[in-house]
């Protein structure tokens, strides 16, 4: 099924793919008349990734029918990283088994990536009984994860009324990042009960890599439960991570 899809701002799209490529080696993207979607798990099955990009966020979206295309994420990332912020990204597929990627700026550069067979995972995004929901600025969570990585390989999230804390403890060091609604970095918090859970820093680092400074990130978690991290792409697109907890001894 041929298609042509145009996205203004190649660098932004590249950052999105780079974030996912840190966790998965290959992906099956479903291309329909409504938009592009992808759901995958990392090889260790610790993180579930759910991506949804509606047709409305693209400047041109010509798709007739439905097709699933499999790609090597590292190859796709390397090509897209060649794009600049003001360049236009064009994705095309004809009758051949290739994805054609064009970067249009002062010149038009075109790459062809071979499509591969990727097994689609049949897993739903579960509805979990989260007891805490936090909306935070992207820069805050990115810096907190960097700080935590200096002292430990896991970070604890703690939410209670009007207060959200991220804490990491090593053998001799510890770091704590605390926010209340008086701080600019914490935009909203809803807590049913005091909630605590720990998560692996290596996974968190990959998940927050593509966040912009002013991006709003929604974090939902429960006591020793998976954490759902969600952020929007141009208001309507959405990237969700579901990360298994680090069970503490």
From Swiss-Prot:
Keywords, comma-separated and alphabetical: DNA replication, DNA-binding
Family matches, as CDD domains: PCNA
GO terms (BP aspect): leading strand elongation; regulation of DNA replication
Gene3D superfamilies attached to this UniProt entry: 3.70.10.10
GO molecular function: DNA binding; DNA polymerase processivity factor activity
UniProt record similarity statement: Belongs to the PCNA family.
Subunit structure: The subunits circularize to form a toroid; DNA passes through its center. Replication factor C (RFC) is required to load the toroid on the DNA. Homotrimer. Interacts with NucS.
Function of the molecule: Sliding clamp subunit that acts as a moving platform for DNA processing. Responsible for tethering the catalytic subunit of DNA polymerase and other proteins to DNA during high-speed replication. Regulates activity of NucS endonuclease and prevents non-specific cleavage.
Annotated protein name in UniProt: DNA polymerase sliding clamp
């Amino acid at each position: 099924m041929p298609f042509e899809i145009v996205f203004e701002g190649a660098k932004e799209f590249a950052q999105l793919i780079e974030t996912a490529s840190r966790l998965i080696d290959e992906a099956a993207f479903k291309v329909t008349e409504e938009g592009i979607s992808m759901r995958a798990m990392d090889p260790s099955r610790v993180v579930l990734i759910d991506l949804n990009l509606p047709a409305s966020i693209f400047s041109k979206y010509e798709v007739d029918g439905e097709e699933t295309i499999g790609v090597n994420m590292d190859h796709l990332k390397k090509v897209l990283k060649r794009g600049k912020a003001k360049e236009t990204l064009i994705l095309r597929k004809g009758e051949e088994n290739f994805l054609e990627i064009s970067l249009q700026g002062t010149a038009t550069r075109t790459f062809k990536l071979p499509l591969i067979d990727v097994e689609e995972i049949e897993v739903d995004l579960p509805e979990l009984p989260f007891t805490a929901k936090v909306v935070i600025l992207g820069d805050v969570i990115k810096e907190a994860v960097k700080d935590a990585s200096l002292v430990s390989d896991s970070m604890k999230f703690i939410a209670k009324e009007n207060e959200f804390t991220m804490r990491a403890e090593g053998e001799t060091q510890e770091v704590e990042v605390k926010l209340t609604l008086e701080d600019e970095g914490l935009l909203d918090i809803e807590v049913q009960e005091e909630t605590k859970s720990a998560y692996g820093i290596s996974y968190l680092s990959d998940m927050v890599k593509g966040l912009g400074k002013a991006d709003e990130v929604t974090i939902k978690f429960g006591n020793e439960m998976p954490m759902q991290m969600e952020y929007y792409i141009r208001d309507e697109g959405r990237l969700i991570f579901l990360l298994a907890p680090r069970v503490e001894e």
